[in-house]
């Protein structure tokens, strides 16, 4: 006969003395079963003595037995057993109601305490000892070390989060309503909160340092959000430092031209201009992967606002635009199955399935056998290949047309310049001939 109590500091398992104290253990089991203790605080902690809880309000003067909840008396008589002693740490006893007389045996409701010391024999015969801790002595150590005020209330809340009945030999009384899920804290319980379990008491000191901590927590939260929605493979991913993002490109700029321009800074592993999947048109940005980080840094400083194909480009590192290179990274996963984008230092967790892995059975709308599914996949692949080839042909044709048009314009301009020069030369020759005739006429007249 046991109960698991989940607290804000850890879990505790209590073994109950159901034969020696049947009425007390029945009361405790049924209160745990209806989640009566949920969100109840440890409101009285005396170091090396005891830790008291069981009052949902945390005031220390509230609470009632399961019999009172079912319409009976709020309290029930204590069950003092002469053979049960408070000799060890972790003994569990019912508290005595303040308005009851200890000499007459006392009465109890819902409050109980756990001993934090040994050989507390002066408690024997005064309180109903109905169980002992079987697991969770490390939690008792944490409770014993809690900082408390003068009344014994911990400054940082220590609360019961949940109770689980592991073994219950007693049938449920008539009228006992067991909730389907844990009830929400009441307004009175929320108002009794002090320092939350997740609040950091050490956040005191330099404001700049505190600001850094806050920003670090926010960044981690944002990264986890991006991981959940799929924008990041995992929250701790580090962007590659040897990859440059190049934007504001001319749509006619080719991959090989861009690679040739950037290759003067160092060896390039890949240079890819990102294109539209449907049309194959350039999206005017690219990623250039260098072998060394130093080469990427040099290219970053020297290629900023450089004119390429009549366009001034902008260069940045890829961590500034992590969303844009997601597709590019995904295409490189074939180079290293256990890495992100082919980089060894970007190892992805196996906690989630990677995109592209085990896709043979992702189609849940229709069920195919392996042969049918393979034929369907081959047809889809062939159709996609034809679509890509058509897109490339359209793009190549459009690019050739643009170059032909530019060549024709250059030829026309050259012809115009030649015509203008010929006209100018003829005009000068004509002037020279007229001038020579006038000189000859002048000489004859003399």
Swiss-Prot record:
Residues in RRM domain copies: 242-320
EC number: 5.2.1.8
GO cellular component, one term: nucleus
Alphabetic keyword roster: Isomerase, Nucleus, RNA-binding, Rotamase
Residue spans of biased composition, Basic and acidic residues class: 390-446
UniProt GO molecular function: peptidyl-prolyl cis-trans isomerase activity; RNA binding
Region annotated Disordered, chain positions: 375-446
Family annotation (SUPFAM superfamilies): Cyclophilin-like, RNA-binding domain, RBD
Places the protein is found: Nucleus
PPIase cyclophilin-type domain ranges (all copies): 1-165
InterPro entries in the cross-refs: CRIP, Cyclophilin-like_dom_sf, Cyclophilin-type_PPIase_dom, Cyclophilin_PPIL4, Nucleotide-bd_a/b_plait_sf, RBD_domain_sf, RRM_dom
SMART domains to which the protein is assigned, alphabetical: RRM
Keyword tRNA-binding in record: no
Function: PPIases accelerate the folding of proteins. It catalyzes the cis-trans isomerization of proline imidic peptide bonds in oligopeptides.
Name recorded for this polypeptide: Peptidyl-prolyl cis-trans isomerase-like 4
Species assigned in the record: Rhizopus delemar (strain RA 99-880 / ATCC MYA-4621 / FGSC 9543 / NRRL 43880) (Mucormycosis agent)
